[in-house]
Amino acid sequence: MNTVRVTFLLVFVLAVSLGQGDKDENRMEMQEKTEQGKSYLDFAENLLLQKLEELEAKLLEEDSEESRNSRQKRCIGEGVPCDENDPRRCSGLVCLKPTLHGIWYKSYYCYKK
């Protein structure tokens, strides 16, 4: 039993004495690792920024493009919103304010003459 204790004590002392390094070495190693991590984070941040700028440019380009659906639509039937100042919108119909009040009370709609 004593040999086991002595062996354990010897292994413990060796592990503690050999395992402890210089504080300066540990500090330098930690600084190197953090600097590498910072450079990696800077690289990742720049890459993400480039991708976001490309995406933003693409979205702005899509918004500014004219499509055939972006032009003003004409009234094609009764009950469709219209502009009171543009009589062409309601061809064959009259652009009037609704008689019933509701959430649409400020807008005009096409009605039959």
Swiss-Prot record:
Tissues in which the UniProt entry reports expression: Expressed by the venom gland.
Keyword Secreted (UniProt): yes
Keyword Disulfide bond set for record: yes
GO cellular component terms listed in the entry, alphabetical order: extracellular region
Domain of life: Eukaryota
Gene Ontology molecular functions: sodium channel inhibitor activity; toxin activity
Pfam (any one): Toxin_22
Keyword line: Disulfide bond, Ion channel impairing toxin, Knottin, Secreted, Signal, Toxin
Protein localization: Secreted
S-S bridge residues: 75-90, 82-95
Propeptide segments, given as residue ranges: 22-74
Region forming the signal peptide: 1-21
Function text: Probable ion channel inhibitor.
Domain text: The presence of a 'disulfide through disulfide knot' structurally defines this protein as a knottin.
Family: Belongs to the neurotoxin 14 (magi-1) family. 01 (HNTX-16) subfamily.
Protein name listed in UniProt: U11-theraphotoxin-Hhn1i
